[in-house]
């Protein structure tokens, strides 16, 4: 199998990511994070960014092999310390209000078998060191977009029955192009129409200002409180300079932050989670008074326990997102082992930090004010998928009356 018009569609994809994703403007700095395997796409992105007037494009290359070798052989004292040059680079990007484009294509199991203690220590150290960048991103001080590219090892996991490596990669690129609307006659217009539909759902939810959400499904009975003056967001966002951008491509979600002090019940994951180079399945979480009191996983149990119990703020939630089961990604029937895609096939929750934009006036609040408003503060943010065609969700008003939001996994409003 050879994907028809691949080069033409890859060029369209690069243009969409640069012009509509991060929305590069004259004078901008762009930081591109991308795997060495995606050299062709990287070059197209760099070319397009400079064509739109970028003053500097910084490419941060990633390599699964190099990363795995580091974790296998580097001593713990090196892994749990972040080098000064990385912090200096972060500060440079922040000072220049650099837009960030992350293109994900890694093998979901690249770090399988690596010492969980090393992974946990490194992730914790990076989370603390990169906190200023995370805060800037989660409060939309800068434009940022997360997208994907078809990596070989990733493609082989998604399409294990493909006739060849080439076919697996082609099949994955085909799904990326479909979900990002590259095959549409006018991808930009298609994105505008899609964003308008999601925005209408967010506006309805913002008008209601529910006090809580109640989720029920096999293995799930969970009530999440919502902060006062919470904000539901959808596809598009606006940075501190007043420039629009698309944080996720693809996207099917409408999301906000729960009140991290108000979560009671239990929830079971419905899709695998790829986190820290490990595939985690069968997650079960129990909450009391907003806190995770028990978490288990059928696969990757220790990785999840380390995430929750070894990172500040990781015992509470920072995001709840609504995604209808009939979404195109869900209906494809494909498990992507990639959060960007799998979270857009399913209702999901995020362990850890909330976005400052999830409450009115949040971007002007201090960390202490955000916490007082009910937004979780943490050095991590990890989504896990809980939706299915058997999930019902009710919005609960202040007076206790209920409004059906989801029935059998789809919008009821």
Where are these regions (language model features)?
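Long, well-ordered mid-to-C-terminal structural blocks that present hydrophobic/aromatic surfaces
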Residues: 256-312
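Short solvent-exposed loop/turn micro-motifs enriched in small/polar/acidic residues
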Residues: 15, 206-208, 276-279, 313, ...
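A short secondary-structure junction signal
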Residues: 112-115, 155-160, 236-237, 278-281, ...
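Active-site bordering "gate/hinge" segments
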Residues: 1-264, 395, 401-403, 411-413
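Dual-mode signal for accessory low-complexity, basic/Gly-rich regions
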Residues: 294-363
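Active-site lining segments that contact anionic ligands and/or coordinate catalytic metals
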Residues: 262-264, 280-282, 289-292, 315-319, ...
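Short linear motifs in exposed loops
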Residues: 225, 295-296, 406
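Extended hydrophobic packing segments that form well-structured cores
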Residues: 368-413
């Amino acid at each position: 199998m050879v994907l028809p018009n691949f080069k033409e569609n890859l060029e369209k994809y690069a243009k969409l990511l640069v012009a509509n994703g991060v929305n590069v403007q004259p004078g901008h700095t762009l930081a591109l994070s991308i795997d060495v395997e995606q050299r062709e796409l990287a070059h197209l992105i760099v070319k397009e960014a400079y064509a739109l007037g970028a003053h500097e494009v910084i490419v941060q290359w990633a390599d699964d092999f190099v990363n795995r070798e580091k974790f296998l052989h580097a001593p713990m004292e090196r892994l749990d310390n972040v080098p000064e040059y990385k912090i200096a680079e972060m500060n440079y990007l922040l000072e220049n209000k650099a837009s960030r484009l992350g293109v994900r294509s890694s093998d979901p199991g690249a770090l399988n078998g690596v010492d969980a203690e090393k992974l946990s220590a490194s992730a914790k150290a990076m989370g603390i060191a990169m906190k200023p960048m995370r805060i800037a991103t989660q409060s939309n001080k800068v434009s940022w977009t997360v997208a994907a590219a078809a990596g070989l090892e990733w493609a082989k996991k998604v399409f294990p029955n493909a006739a060849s490596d080439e076919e697996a990669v082609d099949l994955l690129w085909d799904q990326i192009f479909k979900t990002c609307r590259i095959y549409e006659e006018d991808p930009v217009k298609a994105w505008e129409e899609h964003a308008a539909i999601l925005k209408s759902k967010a506006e309805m939810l913002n008008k209601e200002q529910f006090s809580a959400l109640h989720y029920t499904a096999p293995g799930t009975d969970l009530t999440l409180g919502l902060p006062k003056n919470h904000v539901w967001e959808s596809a598009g966002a606006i940075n501190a300079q007043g420039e629009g951008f698309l944080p996720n491509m693809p996207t099917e979600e409408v999301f906000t932050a729960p009140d991290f002090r108000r979560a009671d019940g239990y929830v079971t994951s419905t899709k695998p989670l790829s986190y820290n180079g490990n595939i985690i399945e069968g997650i079960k979480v129990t909450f009391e008074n907003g806190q995770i009191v028990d978490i288990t996983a059928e696969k990757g149990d220790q990785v999840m326990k380390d995430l929750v119990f070894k990172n500040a703020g990781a015992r509470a939630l920072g995001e709840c997102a609504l995604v209808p089961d009939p979404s195109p990604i869900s209906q494809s029937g494909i498990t992507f082992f990639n959060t960007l895609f799998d979270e857009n096939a399913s209702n999901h929750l995020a362990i850890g930090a909330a976005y400052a934009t999830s409450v009115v006036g949040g971007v002007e609040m201090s960390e202490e004010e955000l916490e007082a408003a009910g937004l979780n503060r943490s050095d991590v943010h990890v989504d896990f998928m809980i939706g299915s065609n058997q999930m019902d969700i009710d919005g609960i008003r202040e007076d206790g009356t209920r409004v059906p939001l989801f029935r059998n996994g789809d919008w009821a409003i």
